[in-house]
Amino acid sequence: MLPKLQPKYISFDAYGTLVNFQMSPPTRVVFADRIGEDQMDEFLDDFEAYRGDEVLGAFKLYPQLVKDALKRACARWKIEYKDSDGEEIVAVVPTWGPYPDVPDALAKLAEHYPLVILSNASEDQIYSNVDKLGAPFHAVLTGEQAGAYKPQFQAFEYMIGKLGCDRSEILHVSSSLYYDIMPAHHLRFTQKVYVNRGFEWVDNAATVSPFNYHEVSDLSGLPDLLGL
């Protein structure tokens, strides 16, 4: 049975949950001269996988993490990597805005709860994205502040310490099982909502019960879950 949602704080992943994550379009443009269109999706998958591996290593600022993941993907594909490739892709991150379902939902939630962001982001990127969300946030917490990225436990423990509350009082919301829902579960966050934007393959029979989360298809469903 899923736990009743009665949070003191609602924390959110940013990129891919609130902010429309758009790293693939500029990557397609940058590498159009080196990767055929019929292979581009596979290259993008590898780039994503290396980002997922890079967050587990020694801390580095997010722009450098993206560049290093891109460099590793290029090495795997035996194609040239140029420093300008990574710079061009990283430069678009602060331009990303919210998904269409986000502003109204956040505005409604902000009337009842203090909202928090916990993002794998650098300080010089995230605030431009947050400004576009149009809602007040009690705290914006980043990987740069924590010295670690999700899914590392250190990032979540940093948030718990900054909020000064018990983890049972935090409702954590994310579109990623890998980066957020699974580590939050292992850290015994009892209140979790998975925003299923279709990024990750989910076998409901295999995952929902072990990780004990509520699920919505987009953020507009979250106020309803909370009875607002």
Where are the model-predicted features located?
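N-terminal helical cap/lid subdomain that shapes the substrate entry/recognition surface
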Residues: 2-100, 124
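Asp-based, Mg2+/Mn2+-dependent phosphohydrolase catalytic module
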Residues: 1-9, 103, 107, 113-228
